[in-house]
Amino acid sequence: MKICIFIFFYIFSSIFYVLAKNNQVDNITAIVNDEIILNSDVNEILVFLKKSKKKFIIPLKSDFLKEKVLEKLIVDSLILQEANSKNINITKEQIDTVIKNIALKKHISVDHFKKQILLRNIKNPSYYDNFIKKIEILLKMKTIQDYELHKRINISEQEVNTIFKKLIKDNEKFKKINLSYILLPSLKQDSDNAVRNRTKIAENIVYKLKKGYDFEKLLIECEKNKSTFIVKKMFWKPLLDIQNSFFKTLNIFKKGQILGPIVGDKGLYILKVNDIHHKKENIVTEFYMQHCLIKPSVILTNTEAKKKIFNIYENIKKGIYTFDDAVKNLSDDYYSSNKKGDLGWISKESLGFDLNKKFLILDKNEISEPVKSNWGWHIFKILDRRQVDAFYKLKKNQAFNIVLNQKIISEKNHWIEDLKNTAYIEIIRS
């Protein structure tokens, strides 16, 4: 429902959550184990929803919106209690990352964003601290949720392949086919003998073609005999239209394919597939690469890691040692260092960070200047490059994500039901 989605959006985008109310006189709306939800907690969200001026499709039931808000607060309380019971702690770095990301999305500096938060409630000196606390609570909830779902979700290759095949089949609708055909036209008044003769001619033509006879040469020959044949060359037509003209199961899958004889409205057709165009093909550049990685750690700061990788780069350039020596003795990627830093074929899109123009024009066996990624500092060596159609790879990933999202929704619901079944929940009607 739209209303549930928006409540979820509000809770997370405004970074609102119910904090314990100390020494505050208020009506208790619900008890969740040893925690309480106050009437003011529910009303605070309801006021926000009204101020947002969003239009909701709400059933006639007068308390529907209030009940949905309360239901969300109960679930959040259960999740937070579960996180606390598992002793989940959030670091200052994690909170700082959230603040940086919010500021980045708003296209402002972190300091400017902090000032915005403080200006929302100048009279309350602890407002910013409460804001930070709310971020911490949300991160706790997300951490325990991710942990639980990771335990519960299993995805089999068969499940992914089922969706993958459906996506590929759906994509067939977007195919365009370049065809040439020879038509042996029929007339309503044709005798049985004429039909048999025409069928025999068509079958002989197909037999010759499958034995290697040149289709273009045959087109020229048939064009001369206009009383028997109609010829059409090199035209594009959507696969869906071709199937509608003949039959739904017509399977066109490769260039040079000969189809026929096929019965159509106007007679017997012999088709040749000249080309196939996938509307959604996705050509990407892949690089065959090795790398040397230096990772920041508890004992090595990012600045020190950067200095170390640039020293390695300079030493390779000066010939003090080779790239392979650096990988074997200095790289922090222990898995690939035993394979000379071999990363295999990787597209620039899958690396997870932007490559500069200098990198993209490197020659084979040339090393890159140090590059920063989420994992640390790299020196890459380009062994080869190629262009590939990533369509099927993308569709496989899409299929996996569809299955994953379905399971996330399903398993999250199961998990919440498990939390409810083992909890004491009392809703107090006023």
Curated annotation (Swiss-Prot):
Disulphide-bridged cysteine pairs: none
InterPro entries: OMP_Chaperone_SurA, PPIase_dom_sf, PPIase_PpiC, PPIase_SurA, SurA_N, Trigger_fact/SurA_dom_sf
Keyword annotations: Chaperone, Isomerase, Periplasm, Repeat, Rotamase, Signal
Ranges of residues in domain PpiC: 174-275, 284-384
Cleaved signal peptide residues: 1-20
Native species: Buchnera aphidicola subsp. Acyrthosiphon pisum (strain APS)
Biological process according to GO: Gram-negative-bacterium-type cell outer membrane assembly; protein folding; protein stabilization
Description of its domains: The PPIase activity resides only in the second parvulin domain. The N-terminal region and the C-terminal tail are necessary and sufficient for the chaperone activity of SurA. The PPIase activity is dispensable for SurA to function as a chaperone. The N-terminal region and the C-terminal tail are also required for porin recognition.
PROSITE patterns to which the protein is assigned, alphabetical: PPIC_PPIASE_2 (PS50198)
Catalyses which reaction(s): [protein]-peptidylproline (omega=180) = [protein]-peptidylproline (omega=0)
Location within or outside the cell: Periplasm
Annotated GO CC locations: outer membrane-bounded periplasmic space
Enzyme class: isomerase
Enzyme Commission code: 5.2.1.8
Domain of life: Bacteria
Protein name: Chaperone SurA
GO molecular function, a single term: peptidyl-prolyl cis-trans isomerase activity
Function: Chaperone involved in the correct folding and assembly of outer membrane proteins. Recognizes specific patterns of aromatic residues and the orientation of their side chains, which are found more frequently in integral outer membrane proteins. May act in both early periplasmic and late outer membrane-associated steps of protein maturation.
